[in-house]
Amino acid sequence: MSTESMIRDVELAEEALPKKAGGPQGSGRCLCLSLFSFLLVAGATTLFCLLHFGVIGPQREELPHGLQLINPLPQTLRSSSRTPSDKPVAHVVANPEAEGQLQWLSRRANALLANGVELTDNQLKVPSDGLYLIYSQVLFTGQGCPSTHVLLTHTISRFAVSYQTKVNLLSAIKSPCQRETPEGAEAKPWYEPIYLGGVFQLEKGDRLSTEINLPAYLDFAESGQVYFGIIAL
């Protein structure tokens, strides 16, 4: 009901009353009716103003300009599923049966070669120019420490087609033994992982390889401990 309709109803009600109410009792009724009419009109007017200017009503959370309240994760997943990646990628794992050497395999669980990357002569061949993330991890293990320090090295090298030479991209060296095991003491096992990773500009036809100095210490007890891979960025 609008404010104008409520005011009109009150005025019609007042006109319907006798113009003159006899005695004090009639005057009291007129006074009460006038007061009630005033309060009714004032309340209706106040309610109309509050609704009109939005002081009361459904609450809305105000967000910064241009920001939509959405969950971006489902949209991102849908977009990625509609647009399969065509970037070169490779992840190869060590052959646990190749004793005394680090041999990479691509036909194993959790291993892959995709979008042009090849595994040839134990090397990853780059299919196109671009930035690549190159990474590799090896895990060494041994029993006790000899009198001479054990130095473990792990290196990733690149044979570039542009200048036909081999250069080291990443390299690390570690020593798991700080002191030799005393004679007669229990020879405790030790484990030493070496991880290498970095981003490099590569050319089509480049070949990437890994090298270690002491393959006899490689630990193949668990899958996923020794691996090598590249990802085009």
From Swiss-Prot:
The record marks S34, L35, L39, L40, C49, L50, L51, H52, T76, L77 as: Cleavage. SUPFAM superfamilies: TNF-like. Coiled coil: none annotated. It comes from the Eukaryota. Residues 1-35 are cytoplasmic. Residues 57-233 are extracellular. It holds the Pfam family TNF. It is found in: Cell membrane. The chain crosses the membrane at residues 36-56. Gene3D superfamilies: 2.60.120.40. GO terms for cellular component: extracellular space; plasma membrane. It is a single-pass type II membrane protein. Keywords: Cell membrane, Cytokine, Disulfide bond, Glycoprotein, Lipoprotein, Membrane, Myristate, Phosphoprotein, Secreted, Signal-anchor, Transmembrane, Transmembrane helix. The modification Phosphoserine is found at S2. GO terms for biological process: extrinsic apoptotic signaling pathway via death domain receptors; immune response; necroptotic signaling pathway; negative regulation of protein-containing complex disassembly; positive regulation of apoptotic process; positive regulation of canonical NF-kappaB signal transduction; positive regulation of extrinsic apoptotic signaling pathway; positive regulation of JUN kinase activity. Disulfide bonds join C145-C177. The soluble form derives from the membrane form by proteolytic processing. The membrane-bound form is further proteolytically processed by SPPL2A or SPPL2B through regulated intramembrane proteolysis producing TNF intracellular domains (ICD1 and ICD2) released in the cytosol and TNF C-domain 1 and C-domain 2 secreted into the extracellular space. PROSITE patterns: THD_1 (PS00251), THD_2 (PS50049). A lipid is attached at K19, K20 (N6-myristoyl lysine). Residues 88-233 form the THD domain. Homotrimer. Interacts with SPPL2B. Belongs to the tumor necrosis factor family. Cytokine that binds to TNFRSF1A/TNFR1 and TNFRSF1B/TNFBR. It is mainly secreted by macrophages and can induce cell death of certain tumor cell lines. It is potent pyrogen causing fever by direct action or by stimulation of interleukin-1 secretion and is implicated in the induction of cachexia, Under certain conditions it can stimulate cell proliferation and induce cell differentiation. Induces insulin resistance in adipocytes via inhibition of insulin-induced IRS1 tyrosine phosphorylation and insulin-induced glucose uptake. The TNF intracellular domain (ICD) form induces IL12 production in dendritic cells. PANTHER family: TUMOR NECROSIS FACTOR (PTHR11471:SF23), TUMOR NECROSIS FACTOR FAMILY MEMBER (PTHR11471). This is Tumor necrosis factor. It comes from Felis catus (Cat).
